Amino acid sequence: MNFLAHLHLATLADSSLLGNLMADFVRGNPEGQYSADVVAGIRMHRRVDVLTDTHPLVIQARHLFSNSYRRVAPITLDIIWDHFLSLNWDKLVPTYSLPAFIHHARSQIEPHLYYTPEKFQELNAFLWRQNWLIRYADLAFIADVLKGMARRHPRLSALSGSFQDIEQHYADFDALFWQFYPYMMEKAENKDFYCLPQ
């Protein structure tokens, strides 16, 4: 799961949006560094990641990638799930629009950035102003995201090429998303992520 999915699942679980979005920028035990609700959000994010990485449908999705790109498939999948969520937001969340959700999330996070990791603050400088979460619906933007990550992290250079597997198996990824993401939504609504190991 990437930024949009983590924020959405956090909302369904009544969990801290700040903690859920920031979790990848926090190393080790967050206890004592942040408030209890933010810590709970960080822990929820980590549980979502564990369940995502080990779920049979996600493992099935990884095998759609060619050998050259399978090593980076988990990262590419995180981004492609956000693509399908952004693209299909109105079907999954008919009660309020994606722009309204993003406005709400931003209002919950930006006032607290001053005490968050510097790299997280840098992310927020682009995430909201450049409308990433809305632009995820555009496959061309997904390609740009993967190229940018590959450029910034040479060890992950295969990310750029992994986009061709997205194009080749797009219908398969779409079908897997519709099996997997509603399941994750249900677990979030049932607060099940509080009961899973990190």
From Swiss-Prot:
Entry keyword set: Fatty acid biosynthesis, Fatty acid metabolism, Hydrolase, Lipid biosynthesis, Lipid metabolism
Coiled-coil stretches noted in the UniProt entry, renumbered to this chain: none
E.C. number(s) listed in UniProt: 3.1.4.14
Alphabetical GO biological process terms: fatty acid biosynthetic process
Domain of life from the UniProt record: Bacteria
Catalytic activity: holo-[ACP] + H2O = apo-[ACP] + (R)-4'-phosphopantetheine + H(+)
PANTHER family: ACYL CARRIER PROTEIN PHOSPHODIESTERASE (PTHR38764:SF1)
Job description of the protein: Converts holo-ACP to apo-ACP by hydrolytic cleavage of the phosphopantetheine prosthetic group from ACP.
Name of the featured protein: Acyl carrier protein phosphodiesterase
Phylogenetic classification of the source organism: Bacteria, Pseudomonadati, Pseudomonadota, Gammaproteobacteria, Enterobacterales
